[in-house]
């Protein structure tokens, strides 16, 4: 492993892989591979990266009719440097998708059952508020896995949570929103804002609750990690792909964990995403009822 790249040298790398990324496209592929009607809504350019994203979505059966293309826009581009233990450094060019006011096809929200807003860039909380308002007007359910720009203003984010149906964060992110030291404390305290809460802590597992049942799960499998890119997207979208179809909290967490585990065994965020019908095995998991003292 290295901690810095020396200047003035040409360094050899073992392998190069090209793939599409971005939180929204990653989660859309999970939904599509689980047999759901998935649609990708965002603003892209006509640059090679944008066209590659569209082709990748089409190949996965993801509807791209809600994508707005503008010649002024340019998709982001990242170089991911992966160490032998699966940890990575990402060199990220954010691209441009309209800044704080991107051109989006908000009408695409109206016919959805669920939306999963993520990685809203410069639009931040105002754009998230607009998306949530559109969803509420048409009784569309919302799962939120907030990113850095949204978490940078936790008080404003909390004001939006009453409209969210499922909230998924890691432990450090949830501690920006509610008090608590353990995963259980954080998840239970977040029930004051959201009806379904998921809090993860990497190899230490995950806690999820719907206010009636609390599930604590460990790792699905203890396997060598090739690349952690997309693991969080795979977990959150894996959960929703099952929960939205009426599966139990326990079943949804098992699939989410399996999906995330599969993704980290491959290079890139999409190759390891599970397909419909895959056989899953049991995992370390504990389930108990939530009582009044908990909340």
Regions found by a protein language model. Give the residues of each.
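Anion (oxyanion) recognition and catalysis
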Residues: 32, 58, 136, 161, ...
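A glycine-rich helix N-cap at a beta->alpha junction
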Residues: 56-73
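Conserved phosphate-binding/catalytic loop of the ribokinase/pfkB sugar-kinase fold
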Residues: 65, 69-70, 80-122
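Conserved beta-alpha-beta core of the PfkB/ribokinase-like small-molecule kinase fold
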Residues: 114-188, 204-206
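Conserved phosphate-binding/catalytic region of the ribokinase-like
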Residues: 151, 183-295
């Amino acid at each position: 492993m290295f901690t810095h790249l020396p200047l003035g040298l040409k360094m050899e790398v073992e392998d190069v892989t090209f793939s599409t990324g971005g939180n929204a496209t990653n989660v859309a592929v999970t939904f599509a591979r689980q047999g759901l009607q998935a649609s990708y809504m965002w603003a892209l350019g006509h640059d090679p990266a944008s066209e590659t994203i569209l082709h990748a979505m089409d190949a996965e059966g993801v509807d791209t009719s809600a994508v707005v293309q503008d010649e002024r826009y340019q998709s982001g581009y990242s170089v991911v440097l992966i160490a032998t233990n699966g940890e990575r450094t990402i060199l990220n060019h954010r691209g441009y998708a309209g800044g704080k006011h991107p051109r989006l096809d908000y009408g695409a929200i109206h016919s959805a059952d669920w939306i999963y807003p993520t990685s809203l860039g410069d639009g931040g909380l105002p754009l998230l508020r607009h998306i949530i308002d559109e969803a509420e007007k048409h009784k569309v359910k919302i799962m939120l896995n907030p990113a850095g720009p949204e978490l940078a203003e936790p008080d404003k984010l909390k004001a939006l949570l009453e409209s969210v149906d499922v909230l998924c964060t890691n432990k450090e992110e949830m501690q920006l929103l509610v008090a608590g030291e353990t995963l259980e404390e954080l998840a239970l305290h977040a029930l004051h804002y959201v009806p379904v809460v998921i809090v993860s802590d990497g190899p230490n597992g995950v806690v999820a609750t719907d206010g009636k049942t609390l599930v604590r799960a460990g790792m699905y499998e203890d396997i060598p990690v090739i690349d952690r890119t997309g693991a969080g997207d795979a977990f959150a979208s894996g959960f929703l792909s099952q929960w939205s179809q009426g599966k139990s909290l326990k079943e949804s967490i098992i699939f989410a964990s399996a999906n995330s585990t599969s993704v980290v065994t491959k290079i890139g965020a999409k190759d390891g995403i599970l397909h419909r019908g895959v056989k899953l095995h049991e995992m370390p998991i504990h389930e108990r009822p939530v009582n009044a003292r908990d909340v």
